[in-house]
């Protein structure tokens, strides 16, 4: 965890555990399909975040991709092969405090049929 804390710009949180969500580009049969690893990993990340909340855990999503420096550091820490790309690191732990629910929903950002 100390390696992540020093490698990531926003990684200074004091969580006891982390999950690194990675895309394995060697799984794709078609060359164009390998471009969608980011979407696949984002869907997996959201599922991890929701499951953690359901278990009473707190999480924070730390972006890694597309910042080459961050990707390189995380790949080195985890000794990832070249075909495995880190998308993010999720810190997981029990929250120190319970914060009130909030939303970032803004109806002005929702467009129907046309922009």
Regions found by a protein language model. Name each.
Residues 1-115:
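Acidic, surface-exposed loops and disordered segments
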């Amino acid at each position: 965890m100390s390696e992540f804390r020093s490698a990531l710009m926003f990684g200074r949180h004091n969580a006891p555990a982390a999950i690194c969500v990675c895309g394995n580009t060697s799984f794709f049969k078609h060359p164009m399909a390998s471009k969608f690893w980011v979407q696949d990993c984002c869907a997996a990340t959201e599922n991890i975040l929701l499951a953690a909340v359901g278990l009473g855990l707190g999480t924070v999503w730390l972006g890694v991709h597309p910042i080459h420096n961050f990707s390189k550091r995380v790949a080195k820490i985890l000794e990832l092969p070249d075909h495995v790309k880190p998308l993010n690191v999720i810190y997981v732990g029990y929250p120190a405090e319970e914060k009130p629910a909030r939303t970032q929903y803004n109806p002005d950002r929702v467009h129907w049929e046309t922009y």
